[in-house]
């Protein structure tokens, strides 16, 4: 009899015990009118999003999100979509409401005037179109007036002032060896396509990208009045110069190693790398003394920059600078230029078929350049105090769980554990918004001229950064704006930062069960804390210094465990012939693996001394935890954006951010009663465990 049942539906019996129970429950639920009428989230988990036809032990990402993705196609103006991205779009709508509700009369220099007039100028598309390229002409005229390459160098400094930072960029950076001090950092920035491989690799997709880029450059020059022949020649000039800079630029995997860009230098050493650039005049323009502490990220790049100053013609340098100015300023220029910019960067590279509506583009720009002014208004209206208090408690619990986890690592010596404890003890969490807001009152924001207003706001960003150079580090500064739906870890400050924008569903629910919040925002917290001990963060000690604090054997074991994670992700294919680069995504993957484990431990610890929470909708608290994580990372993504991510992004695509870490966790296997041979259970000899 049993064999007969198996023959009729053999797949049913190969499924996990949990999946068989779930399908039986689903059959009962479908007979219940009460269940049919109930289609709303409960404590943060919307069970209607689950694809119950999929065994969670086979593909947990599809189980957690399959129905939601089927019902929610990616909007035409987005390159990916999920509840998390939906929440980000909700935040933009909230910012729009703030901006459009500002009073008509605003005092000059007030927050309301600064953000309101910037947004209003950006929204005045008819005036932007009517002005045409007139605002760009004075810049082009300055470039045209140069009699030799040396005469272009002061213009490079002026362009750097408005964030047109080519072919190098000067910015602030904490000293890797004295992180209490801020030094001047000279970085490479010689090309505009997403990655050096787009210029150098012979693969068909990269060859096609080069052809599309040439066509795009030519179209952009034609839109500012150049003829077909001149535009095509200019495109080839830009491609030639950018390719030369790409050839000497470090690749993204190498750039993940802090020591690869750690080159503390003097003014004399910088001058020796590029003696044909007038560094004395450049530093004078930037109001920096020549004896300022500095770092040169890529010395070989600076040597190539010097060669190009000698070998590239004046005419070609002029084209290169004009292109970078035009490319950077497209967001503030007439609609045809902005549209062509989208055609290449949005449609071709990322796969989006429509531009975002203008109000979204203008809201994004306001946040990008005037983020703390707008953010102050945002937190006043949308960030409840109880959210910050709940987050502070969760961060404390996650830090304690990370501490306990490290202390139980059998492969670490007591000496290394003690140093790790010092790092845990000095973690500095920042939640919601900065204690002190930036002062934008002197920024010349005008409602009637968007191009100039856009450049004035950019100049503020550059000057605000430059003014920190040569001074003690200000630990109160933030690297993200309050409305940002993201988080980050800074190893030089040993801080984890969670802006207000991420502290909303689906990451965080004030009224949710602990299982849901620990599974979503808890894993995010654990992820950021784990960055302090990933392949990059582990190179910095508790004071933020780039210094080895590991014993030789412990470091060897750590690298071996990291290699396991890299190998796992090397084998995740996006499409035939294209797979993740495990070394590129190693840090984020260690963060996801450590974050999921530590958050689960913290959740378990939070239950000590309390009655066991009840099941909800047939799901145990442990299952709710993992579903919350799966749904937080439940992105749908366009193929073009997926290819771009695999090439350039240190984050794996969302599917593998769910499947990858969970398939290593016995806690997940136990929660869903997965068979040992299930796809979501890695073989014992393949399990990766770092933390």
Q: Where do the language-model regions lie?
A:
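Sec-dependent signal peptide recognition
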Residues: 20-27
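Active-site-surrounding "flap" and adjacent substrate/cofactor-binding loops of secreted or lumenal enzymes
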Residues: 54-127
């Amino acid at each position: 009899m049993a064999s007969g049942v198996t023959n009729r539906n053999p797949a049913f019996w190969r499924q996990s015990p949990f999946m068989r129970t779930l399908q039986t429950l689903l059959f009962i639920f479908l007979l219940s009118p009460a269940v049919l009428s109930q289609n709303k989230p409960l404590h943060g988990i919307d069970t209607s999003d689950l694809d119950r036809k999929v065994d969670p032990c086979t593909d947990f990402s599809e189980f957690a999100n399959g129905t939601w993705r089927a019902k929610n196609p990616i909007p035409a103006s987005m390159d990916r979509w999920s509840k998390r991205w939906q929440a980000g779009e909700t935040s933009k709508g909230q910012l729009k409401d703030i901006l459009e509700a500002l009073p008509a009369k605003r005092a000059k220099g007030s927050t309301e005037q600064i953000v309101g007039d910037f947004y209003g100028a950006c929204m005045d598309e008819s005036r932007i179109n009517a002005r045409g390229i007139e605002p760009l002409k004075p810049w082009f005229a300055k470039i045209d007036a140069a009699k030799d390459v040396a005469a272009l160098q002061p213009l490079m400094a002026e362009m750097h002032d408005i964030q047109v930072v080519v072919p190098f960029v000067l910015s602030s950076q904490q000293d890797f060896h004295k992180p209490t001090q801020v030094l001047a950092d000279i970085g490479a920035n010689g090309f505009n396509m997403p990655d050096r491989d787009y210029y150098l690799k012979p693969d068909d997709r990269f060859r096609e990208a080069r052809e599309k880029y040439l066509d795009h450059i030519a179209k952009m020059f034609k839109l500012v009045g150049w003829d077909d022949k001149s535009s095509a020649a200019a495109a080839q000039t830009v491609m030639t110069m950018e390719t030369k800079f790409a050839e000497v630029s470090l690749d993204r995997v190498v750039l993940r190693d802090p020591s690869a860009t750690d080159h503390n230098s003097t003014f004399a050493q910088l001058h020796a790398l590029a003696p044909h650039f007038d560094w004395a005049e450049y530093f004078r323009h930037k109001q920096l003394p020549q004896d300022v502490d500095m770092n040169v990220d890529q010395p070989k790049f600076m040597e190539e920059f010097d060669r190009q100053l000698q070998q590239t013609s004046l005419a070609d340098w002029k084209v290169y600078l004009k292109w970078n100015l035009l490319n950077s300023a497209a967001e503030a220029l007439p609609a045809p230029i902005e549209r062509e910019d989208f055609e290449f960067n949005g449609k071709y590279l990322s796969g989006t078929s429509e531009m975002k509506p203008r109000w979204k583009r203008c809201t994004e720009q306001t946040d990008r350049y005037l983020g703390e002014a707008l953010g102050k208004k945002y937190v006043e209206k949308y960030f409840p105090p109880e959210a910050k208090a709940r987050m502070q408690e969760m961060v404390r619990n996650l830090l304690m769980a990370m501490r306990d986890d490290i202390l139980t690592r059998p492969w670490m010596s007591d000496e290394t554990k003690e140093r790790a404890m010092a790092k845990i003890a000095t973690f500095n969490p920042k939640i919601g918004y900065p204690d002190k807001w930036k002062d934008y009152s002197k920024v010349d924001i005008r409602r009637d001229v968007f191009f100039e207003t856009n450049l004035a706001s950019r100049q503020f960003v550059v000057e605000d950064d430059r003014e920190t150079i040569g001074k003690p580090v200000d630990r109160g500064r933030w690297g993200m704006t309050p409305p940002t739906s993201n988080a980050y870890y800074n190893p030089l400050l040993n801080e984890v930062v969670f802006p207000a924008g991420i502290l909303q569903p689906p990451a965080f629910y004030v009224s949710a069960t602990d299982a849901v919040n620990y599974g979503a925002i808890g894993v995010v917290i654990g992820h950021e804390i784990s960055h302090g001990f990933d392949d990059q963060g582990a190179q910095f000690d508790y004071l933020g210094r780039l210094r080895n604090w590991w014993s030789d054997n412990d470091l060897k074991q750590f690298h071996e465990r990291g290699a396991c994670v890299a190998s796992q992700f090397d084998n995740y294919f996006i499409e035939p012939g294209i797979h993740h680069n495990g070394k590129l995504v190693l840090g984020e993957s260690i963060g996801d693996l450590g974050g999921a484990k530590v958050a689960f431990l913290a959740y378990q610890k939070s239950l000590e001394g309390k009655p066991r929470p009840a099941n909800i909708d047939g799901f145990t608290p442990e299952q709710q935890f993992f579903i919350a994580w799966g749904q937080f990372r439940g992105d749908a993504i366009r193929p073009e954006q997926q290819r771009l991510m695999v090439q350039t992004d240190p984050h794996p695509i969302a599917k593998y951010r769910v499947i990858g870490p969970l398939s290593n966790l016995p806690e997940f296997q136990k929660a869903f009663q997965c068979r040992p041979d299930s796809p979501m259970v890695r073989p014992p000899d393949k399990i990766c465990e770092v933390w």
